[in-house]
Regions:
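Conserved catalytic-core motifs of GNAT/GCN5-like acyltransferases
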Residues: 102, 120-136
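Conserved G/P- and acidic residue-centered "switch" motifs that form tight phosphate/ATP-binding loops
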Residues: 44, 78, 95, 107
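Conserved beta-strand segments that form the floor/walls of ligand-binding pockets within enzyme
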Residues: 38, 51, 65, 69, ...
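Short hydrophobic/aromatic beta-strand or adjacent loop that forms the aromatic wall/cage
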Residues: 34-36, 138-143
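Conserved GNAT acetyl-CoA-binding A-motif
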Residues: 91-102
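Conserved acetyl-CoA-binding loop-helix of GNAT-fold acetyltransferases
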Residues: 68-70, 76-93, 112-116
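Conserved active-site alpha-helix within GNAT-family acetyltransferase domains
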Residues: 106-123
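Acetyl-CoA-dependent GNAT
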Residues: 2-61
Length: 148
């Protein structure tokens, strides 16, 4: 657990991140260390989930450093963008100078979240056949870069 930093400060007046688990690096799979969180309102109500992967490699260019999902009843409130801002804070603790977030080209809401959170669109990339996202049916991702 020495690699992971405290997360109690990941909150604002609108959202907070509650750590659910961490995952050590698994180099044989191309996985970097990761944090997994519930996204919650200040009263503790769970409204979604997010994760932060620490590091950079070819697999993460496609999969991204950050993933998020907001429960349907809570969508439209910019909670994902607010959670991303908190994840950026955690990424800075690890010395990351930038993070990548990717989304399916058909997911306009996620692309909008990337724009609201300050991402710079880089490209729409083809997913390699050996990537786990390809196995799950995805073929392309929009790639956004966020300077930290």
């Amino acid at each position: 657990m020495a690699f992971f930093f405290p997360t109690e400060d990941l909150k604002t007046g609108e959202v907070m991140l509650r750590l659910t688990r961490t995952c050590e690096a698994q180099p044989e799979k191309g996985w970097v260390p990761a944090y997994y969180f519930d996204i919650c309102l200040p009263d503790g109500t769970r409204i979604g989930e997010c994760d932060l992967r620490i590091g950079h490699n070819g697999r993460l260019y496609i999969g991204g450093n950050i993933g998020y999902e907001i429960e349907e009843a809570y969508r439209g409130n910019r909670y994902a963008a607010k959670a991303c801002e908190l994840l950026f804070r955690q990424a800075r603790k690890h010395g990351l100078e930038y993070v990548i977030i990717t989304c399916d080209p058909s997911n306009r809401a996620s692309a909008r979240t990337c724009e609201l959170a300050g991402g710079r669109y880089l490209e729409t990339a083809e997913i390699p056949e050996d990537h786990d996202m390809f196995e799950r049916g995805f073929r392309q991702v929009m790639v956004y870069r966020f300077e930290l």
